[in-house]
């Protein structure tokens, strides 16, 4: 399994021949140099409706025919734009090409904020991608919440966690380190930081905190465009 980071919360997970793109904020992402036209995903998962997460999802889906996966409200919005989409809700799971995609809770807002009028984008979420190589938890935008320990950590037990550390709009390094301690993944990759001045963070500080909260977890810090093989 290959996990590639494109800055902010944009990742592509490749397992066998299936490519899953998550929160593809690409063309307006100031730290990403990859062109939108380079993406050829099979599936696009969107955690919520904010423009820095929905990003280029609709453009990529229209060009490639990729299936959009999101909460019910966003899925209806996508379908009304003529795009192939399937809706889910918290706790649900679907399977595509032998890969499980489970929607889990996140503590954040989700209005669609790039149209002329702000409209409801349903509830923000995270995803657990279950491949034959392992499980990856993409937290989306979220604050710290107890189900990270009681549900995500205790029941779903992801091998890899992708956690926001930018603060202000999500967890900061301290709370993200607590989350890592609750979830206890084998690996944790920080995300949603250093895209804009208001979320500037030093990921090495996060790594130092995780050494204390979850000594068995390795922190993997990727450069933008870099990837990790698991």
UniProtKB/Swiss-Prot annotation:
Keywords of this entry: Hydrolase
Presence of keyword Hydrolase: yes
GO MF annotations in UniProt: hydrolase activity
A Pfam family reported for this protein in Swiss-Prot or TrEMBL: Lactamase_B_3
Annotated S-S bridges: none
InterPro entries referenced in this protein's UniProt entry, alphabetically: Metallo-B-lactamas (IPR001279), RibonucZ/Hydroxyglut_hydro (IPR036866), UPF0173 (IPR022877), UPF0173_UPF0282_UlaG_hydrolase (IPR050114)
HAMAP family linked to this entry: UPF0173 (MF_00457)
Name of the protein this chain belongs to: UPF0173 metal-dependent hydrolase MTH_1902
The organism of origin for this protein: Methanothermobacter thermautotrophicus (strain ATCC 29096 / DSM 1053 / JCM 10044 / NBRC 100330 / Delta H)
Record lineage: Archaea, Methanobacteriati, Methanobacteriota, Methanomada group, Methanobacteria
């Amino acid at each position: 399994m290959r996990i590639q980071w494109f800055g902010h919360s944009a990742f592509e997970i490749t397992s066998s021949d299936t490519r899953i793109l998550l929160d593809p904020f690409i063309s307006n992402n100031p730290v990403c140099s990859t062109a939108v036209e380079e993406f050829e995903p099979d599936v696009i998962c969107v955690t919520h409706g904010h423009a820095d997460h929905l990003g280029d999802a609709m453009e990529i889906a229209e060009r490639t025919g990729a299936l959009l996966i999101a909460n019910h409200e966003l899925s209806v919005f996508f379908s009304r734009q003529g795009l192939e989409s399937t809706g889910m809700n918290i706790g649900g799971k679907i399977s595509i090409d032998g890969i499980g995609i489970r929607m889990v809770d996140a503590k954040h807002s989700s209005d669609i904020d790039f149209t002329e009028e702000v409209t409801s984008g349903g509830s923000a979420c995270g995803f657990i991608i279950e491949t034959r190589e392992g499980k990856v938890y993409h937290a989306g935008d979220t604050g710290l919440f107890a189900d990270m320990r009681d549900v995500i950590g205790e029941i779903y037990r992801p091998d890899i966690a992708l956690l926001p550390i930018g603060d202000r709009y999500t967890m900061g390094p301290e709370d993200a380190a607590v989350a890592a301690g609750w979830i206890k993944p084998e690996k944790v990759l920080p995300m949603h930081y250093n895209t804009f001045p208001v979320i500037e963070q030093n990921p090495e500080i996060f790594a130092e905190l995780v050494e204390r909260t979850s000594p068995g977890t390795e922190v993997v810090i990727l450069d933008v465009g870099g990837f990790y093989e698991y």
